[in-house]
Each structure stands twice: as structure tokens, then as C-alpha cells.
Swiss-Prot record:
GO terms for molecular function: DNA binding. GO terms for biological process: negative regulation of DNA-templated transcription. Negative regulator of class I heat shock genes (grpE-dnaK-dnaJ and groELS operons). Prevents heat-shock induction of these operons. This is Heat-inducible transcription repressor HrcA. The keyword Repeat does not apply. Pfam families: HrcA (PF01628). Belongs to the HrcA family. It comes from Thermoanaerobacter pseudethanolicus (strain ATCC 33223 / 39E). Keywords: Repressor, Stress response, Transcription, Transcription regulation.
Length: 343
């Protein structure tokens, strides 16, 4: 059932107050502080309806209400609708003549964003020159198992254990090693994808049953070789929130920031605009009490990385969405002007 204007006003009032105070809010407080034009009793009934609909929660029977993840989502979606075709009403004088390494420029902007927002910011650095596979070696360890060894042109070595659905004669490993090195070693990602999709199964002939394992492993190795560095700034800001005065909860947050592999997935762009994940919407259990606001930065329209803000679900979404929108646009413009002829 869609929310009428009265319920929307009450929901926005609860969210606004909770963002500022971190305390449950009751109907009398809303009636006094917000010019909604309704009695406390009417507001109480509407809040009960909002709770039944899943937009509000009551942490204790005697307490007021707080927003649920569904309530935050409704609030955020209404904010994002205003940003689709409009620039935010604020701007920062952050452009300057910069001669620096690419990563340092991105880190500078992430640092500025952390200082402005008083939140933890994370940035996914691009790999402009990804490693290429120099050599592949398949090593049999059992009749239905092999080690898939990958060596890159920069000396990185990765190995994977493949479990096959059928036994494989050891005599075919020389053929497989020669085939994969001829078709993959030193080749571009585009050429490798074409080989995997169009030619590999046909070339394997009777051994096509191992094609899926080989393809999945090669794609996984390519993905891992392209994984980027993660930079975090403003990590101590989380301690400014009452929710994280608890040492156990704070420790879990800092452990999360140390998990670069998880953050790499969290920052993977899913839409070409500002993306907000609220509490339970995050797929990782470690993120269930947190919200993430992320967006991409670009060079001449090409996405090269992601910047995100991480904090408790009780964050000022309107302010943070505005600020990350401005900063990533500034960063994209600066990078495009500096690296116009290089990328």
C-alpha cells in the first residue's frame, strides 16, 4: 500500500530526528518539534500503521519508534530521485593544479570527503595496466584433480585446485599445457575471452568435459589479477557515533576495513549512478548494521574506480549523497583533464 502524504511527513520526521539524536522518537515529540499539523494521538496512530507496514520499528515496548531499513530505503529513494537530473546545491573549491600519481589524486579526494562528511570513506583504485598471463601450467595431483598454475608478466604466481568430474589420463597434460599457453599467454583479455567462448570446447574434443572447470578457473584468475587496491580514510570517525561506543562493535568495524577482499566486492559498481545499500540490503553479514553510499568516478566517461561512504544506518543520507555526488564529479573532471591523452 503506498504511503499517503501524512504518513510520509511523519516518517520523514522520525528519520530526521533519529539521525540527529540516535534516540527513539515518540508522537508527542513529533507534534511539538515538527509542524505537521496533527495531534499527538493522530500521529501515534499513524506511527503504529507505519510500524505495521514495516517502515518503523519499536526497540522497546515503552520506547518511541526508530526507522527500519525499509523506512530508510523509502527516504533514500526520494532523495535520489532529486539527484538524477539535478546538480546538488553545494560546491567545493577543490580543483587545483596537481601533478601527482593517479592513486595519490584519488586518495586526496577520499581524504577530503572523509573530512567534510565526518564519515569513513573508502576508494577502489583502478588498475590501468592489468597484469597479463605469462605462463600456465597444469600439474596432475590425482586422476581427477589438477593444480592450475598461473604466472604473470610481473611475477605474480597464483594456483588453483581443480576437481574434475571424470578421470583424466596424465598423458594429455602436455597437450593441455601447450594449448593454453599458445592461446592465452601474453594475450589480451579480449582475445582470451574469445578463445574461451568460441574455440576451447571444440579444440578439447573428447576432453570437453573439463572445459567448464578450465574456463571458470581462467576467468577467476583474470578477475583476481585485475582486483584493485582499497584505500580507507577517516576510519576513526565511526567512534563518534553512539552506536559504536561499544568496543566489540567498533572492533568488528575495524576488522571489516581490514578485509580488502570484502570491501572490493562492496565497492563493485552495480549502477552507473549513486548507489545506496542500507543495513540488511547488504549481502555480507558484516555489513548488516551499516549503510554504504557509493558512486563511480570516470575518465572521459569511462568508469575507472569507485568511492564510497560507510557508516551506521542512522546517517544523514541527504547531506552525504549531495557531498559524494559533488566530490566524484570534481574528481572525474580533474582526472579527465590530466589523463586525457594517456588513457
Amino acid at each position: 500500500m503506498p504511503l499517503d502524504d501524512r504518513k510520509k511527513k511523519i516518517l520523514y520526521a522520525v528519520i530526521t530526528d533519529y539521525i540527529m539524536t540516535a534516540e527513539p522518537i515518540g508522537s508527542r515529540t513529533i507534534a511539538k518539534k515538527y509542524n505537521i499539523g496533527l495531534s499527538s494521538a493522530t500521529i501515534r496512530n499513524e506511527m503504529a500503521d507505519l510500524e505495521e507496514m514495516g517502515y518503523l520499528e519499536q526497540p522497546h515496548t515503552s520506547a518511541g519508534r526508530i526507522p527500519s531499513d525499509k523506512g530508510y530505503r523509502f527516504y533514500v529513494d526520494s532523495i535520489l530521485r532529486n539527484y538524477i537530473n539535478n546538480d546538488p546545491p553545494i560546491s567545493y573549491n577543490t580543483r587545483e593544479e596537481i601533478i601527482a600519481e593517479f592513486d595519490e589524486i584519488v586518495k586526496k579526494y577520499a581524504r577530503i570527503l572523509a573530512n567534510i562528511t565526518h564519515h569513513t570513506t573508502v576508494a577502489k583504485m583502478p588498475k590501468l595496466n592489468p597484469d597479463r598471463i605469462k605462463k600456465i601450467q597444469l600439474i596432475p595431483v590425482a586422476s581427477n584433480k589438477m593444480i592450475f598454475l598461473v604466472v604473470t608478466d610481473t611475477g605474480i604466481v597464483k594456483n588453483y585446485l581443480l576437481n574434475l568430474c571424470q578421470n583424466v589420463d596424465r598423458t594429455i597434460f602436455e597437450f593441455l599445457n601447450n594449448l593454453l599457453n599458445e592461446k592465452i599467454a601474453g594475450k589480451s583479455e579480449k582475445d582470451i575471452f574469445e578463445f574461451l567462448q568460441q574455440d576451447l570446447r571444440q579444440m578439447l574434443g573428447e576432453m570437453a568435459f573439463i572445459a567448464d572447470e578450465l574456463i571458470n578457473t581462467i576467468l577467476l584468475s583474470l578477475k583476481q589479477l585485475q582486483e584493485t587496491d582499497i584505500y580507507a580514510d577517516g576510519t576513526s570517525h565511526i567512534l563518534d557515533f553512539p552506536e559504536y561506543k561499544d568496543l566489540g562493535k567498533a572492533k568488528n568495524f575495524f576488522n571489516l576495513l581490514d578485509n580488502k577482499s570484502l570491501l572490493n566486492e562492496v565497492l563493485e559498481p552495480e549502477v552507473d549512478f549513486i548507489d545506496v545499500r542500507i543495513g540488511s540490503e547488504n549481502k555480507f553479514e558484516e555489513m548488516k548494521d551499516l549503510s554504504v553510499i557509493k558512486t563511480t568516478y570516470k575518465i572521459n566517461g569511462r568508469v575507472v574506480g569507485t568511492i564510497g561512504i560507510i557508516g551506521p544506518t542512522r546517517m544523514d543520507y541527504r547531506k552525504l549523497i549531495s557531498e559524494i555526488n559533488v566530490m566524484t564529479k570534481e574528481l572525474s573532471n580533474l582526472l579527465s583533464s590530466i589523463y586525457n591523452d594517456e588513457i
